[in-house]
């Protein structure tokens, strides 16, 4: 039988929950319009677990660009237009820059050290200061030297690729790039332990972040229960210990390296005084953990777009060939700046299939008013990037893949990296990766459907897998064929001529930072 203390605790939890529910009912205010709620549960019964983009899209069409929902004790605001997102999340960022409380993935499995989930405050500002120091445009320009080398290897690796392993080779590129910067070591093969282990940890993190997986996220007061009544605590602690052990291993090896890397950069005189050892490991680690998967997903979406839209590929190839002389040389970062259709292809890929359809939710730090509606304190605010990208009022024929729209109207909005103070800190390096990899792959390869037993393997452009806030193409097959023997020869010589010694590569980057 349960002890009197446990019974008392459960009674307190129940009473507190009912009290909070009562207060939320009597203090409703005038929320933005939305589907009619039911007593107590609000709109929980209507909130989609699958096909979320379609349901949200219908709500915006019915109720407008800002939709209000009640999810039990919580209020959720869906923002479906760039204008509203910029007003609330950008211009009013001082009060819209926090995050909803996430007990399992944030507080337990990461001990409050995951930057993306942190509430706005001194701790997040510390993380953001370090990330900005490493990812500002000046620093990122130095990283192009490494991106040049890694993308040469990717283009070369795909010469021997199959119709189904291009994703693994892309993942190697994005993982090796960030791992070399963070810890001073490149990852030459896609089966490297560091890549596989990080993928496992990232997968566990995303699973724990999924809405509805853990009751404690819906009712945080349950976290006051003792461990034997709260099995999620043990699970979360085991996940954290596995992750932190990996970070310690990476850090120890990085500090032994003779040359510059992010870890060494912030473990010397530049170490923030207020950052503990554990926190600093997490600050660096999250850049590798988050950046590898997001860049991979975006580039896989690019391959899908290239297979499905050969006319757009032929046009961009003609532009590249005219500048670099066909197969004479591989395009460079300097060339990318002179290739407007390449830039348009990148923008259209990010719009056509956004990898974070709803972004990472924001949380309101104090009550606000907008267009006569009340947005209560602690409301969850979701920037519905999918709806924004598919809004015919902004993008003519939004379902079509049309890179030329960005040449016809260069002022079209982009939201792929989020809004306001919580915009992706790695957006500059990610965009550089997108541009150089797409440009070089379009120069080097023709993209086609795979064929099996003489039959074309179809690709469903809507078959994407949701993992937490991320969306990536479900596994698909594609044939990447080198455009000519001359292209293949140039690809091979480009890799041969590039520096392969990681210490020399990082020393070159560091020399420009002095």
Swiss-Prot record:
Catalytic reactions of this protein: asperaculane D + reduced [NADPH--hemoprotein reductase] + O2 = asperaculane E + oxidized [NADPH--hemoprotein reductase] + H2O + H(+)
Main subcellular localisation: membrane
GO CC, one annotated term: membrane
Key words of the record: Glycoprotein, Heme, Iron, Membrane, Metal-binding, Monooxygenase, Oxidoreductase, Transmembrane, Transmembrane helix
Alphabetical list of Pfam families matching this protein: p450
Pathway: Secondary metabolite biosynthesis
Membrane disposition: Single-pass membrane protein
Binding of heme, residues: 424
Broad class of enzyme this protein falls into: oxidoreductase
Glycan attachment residues as annotated in the record: 113, 261, 347
Required co-factors: heme
SUPFAM superfamilies, alphabetized: Cytochrome P450 (SSF48264)
PROSITE patterns listed in its UniProt record: CYTOCHROME_P450
EC number in record: 1.-.-.-
GO molecular function, one term: oxidoreductase activity, acting on paired donors, with incorporation or reduction of molecular oxygen
Mutant phenotype after disruption: Abolishes the formation of aculene A and accumulates asperculane C as a major product and 14-prolyl asperculane C as a minor product.
Record field: transmembrane: 6-26
Localization: Membrane
Known function: Cytochrome P450 monooxygenase; part of the gene cluster that mediates the biosynthesis of aculenes, a unique type of norsesquiterpenes that contain a nordaucane skeleton linked to an L-proline moiety and are of mixed biosynthetic origin. The pathway begins with the synthesis of dauca-4,7-diene by the terpene cyclase aneC using farnesyl pyrophosphate (FPP) as substrate.
Similarity remark: Belongs to the cytochrome P450 family.
Protein name, as recorded: Cytochrome P450 monooxygenase aneD
Source organism: Aspergillus aculeatus (strain ATCC 16872 / CBS 172.66 / WB 5094)
